Regions:
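Conserved beta-strand termini and adjacent loop/short-helix elements that scaffold enzyme active sites
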Residues: 25-27, 96-98, 115
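C-terminal interaction surface of TIR/SEFIR-family domains
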Residues: 103-140
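Short beta-strand/turn micro-motifs composed of small residues
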Residues: 1, 53, 95-97
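Nucleic-acid nuclease catalytic cores
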Residues: 89-103
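Conserved N-terminal substructure of TIR/SEFIR domains
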Residues: 1-49, 87, 138-140
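Short acidic/His/Gly/Ser-rich catalytic and metal-binding motifs that mark active-site loops
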Residues: 8, 57-63, 103-106
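TIR-domain catalytic/interaction hotspot
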Residues: 27-78, 83-86
Length: 140
């Protein structure tokens, strides 16, 4: 996740509502671990990950001087997304995208779900969780 605390809390409450326990890294004790060490540690304990792409940075190619910078997720989020796909398998990672965010375009087969205000994302995430073998409580 990036710095959008509202989105992070909304997703965490949904995860709880379907009977699962969310792990939000910055809420866990560091125990002297770096962020990547915390991800390594907790990735060993989970079978599925949700990654939040929120508008926390702006960017464009160095030679794209006539192009306005696009909203992007923080670089660490993109890195952590890739790490989790490698660790858990691509089918066990779902990226939630809030707003018009530039996403990595060279990763094929990645599931991106729009984190929409109406909440349709919840149905999509539930489908992904069920496809990964999770039994969920009804959330409607």
């Amino acid at each position: 996740h990036g710095r959008d605390n509202e989105a992070k809390q909304e997703v965490a409450r949904f995860v709880e509502s379907v009977g699962l326990t969310p792990i939000i890294l910055h809420e866990q004790a560091s125990g002297g671990k770096t962020i990547i060490e915390k991800i390594e540690h907790y990735a060993d304990e989970v079978g599925f990950a949700l990654v939040l792409y929120t508008a926390c940075d702006h960017g464009r190619g160095i030679h794209e001087t006539k192009v306005h910078p696009k909203q992007r997720a923080r670089q660490n989020v993109v890195f952590e997304h890739g790490y989790l796909m490698a660790k858990l398998d691509r089918g066990n990672v779902c990226a939630l995208v809030k707003g018009e965010i530039e996403t990595p375009n060279d990763i094929s087969g990645v599931v991106y779900v729009a984190l929409d205000a109406a909440g349709a994302w919840k149905t999509e995430v539930a489908k992904e969780l069920k496809a990964s073998g999770y039994s969920l409580k009804e959330f409607f």
